[in-house]
């Protein structure tokens, strides 16, 4: 099948409205959120999973590459082309029109189709007294449920571990190049692909069709695993073979039509403790006690260094206000609006580069102070900050421990009221985008960002990084923050103009190798990191012809994995 014949077939399947070939209009699908860009023959937006299957059939017949893409919010370019050096044309299948979520088993599980988002799932479950796997961070900017599963995404919630399921419906191309539909959802939906996909889309199945022993719907072992604080290995990271299972961790090497996931009861009684210290050993003691000794695991434990606090204070202020005013559920629309403004700005010669960021930063100067006095006082007194959230019996447990511990140590804590709780959580969220804003506003002095996503050994007591001067003097600002209980850190470095960011990153990664760290921890390899041998092997097993998302993890982009 020629390229023109393929385009004709795809148009017949989805209609002219939902196939895009104009490079100017496909840019938002071909370009990653932070990283990655390349050409594509077409972007196709199916409205049903049966259309998605027909698109894939045509692409296999035409021998083209297929990149399945949902929200395209990944930070490492994992759902876009990267460069133009593939040996076949690329078709991007964007799944966001297929956003159906079905609750099953008394709301204790959900079946999510490819376009469903974490944000949407959270809203659906809230009145039912349930929660999804993730309720912070990526859920706020529109990330998809399936994107999280396919990339073993982590998150702030200690008790739930990385996104994981053993129940999925997916398409695979076998070694002979034949397309197969595999139903491991544990739901009897019929025999043919057409029956299975149509019945699932329309929720044409009953309770008796649902198997209760079809597999795990989340990582059951993580609660005990994270408690092993003396183990010389990381708690969670993307290349961990223990969390690779078909769709889970597949990174687009399968086309996934649906996943079945567990939901979780809402934590009724919670409290947030804001902890400050100038001694990293004190935070280490708290982490080891909370994980190794507390009866109740923390809900979350988020670390912020003073310098990250300061950058977010200035460059995340408007983000803070927007979420406080409109709520996280409006953020996807606002991010989409921002992207539209930026695309318009590129076409208008007199507007500055990064127009929307510079405009919002200017406006933020006139906003009133947004942080409570208690947090500002701790910023002045203490270098290291920990936001510890506990639930149920863990509230009294943590309160008693912290009171006794700080009676004879140099740091301090306070229990947050409602306003302080909201401010602490929003400020932590604002840190994540502050470095990007800084880069956009100061593009005349910043070369670029180096953003590392790392998992330290669970027994690593010397967790705070000290860079050698030859690296440190090339950096304007360092932002350290992360999921402290899991020992997962996000480290954003704003690099001075004129330096080689890739070379600097390699030097930093070499230092992390010496410390026994793993990377990436939760953003997956995308086209930014090299996949470890076990991960490469997993990808080859899933996709022996290398037809899905080739080049991921710096692997071969050629058919049948040719070098």
Language model: regions and residue ranges:
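FAD-binding subdomain of flavoenzyme oxidoreductases
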Residues: 119, 126-282
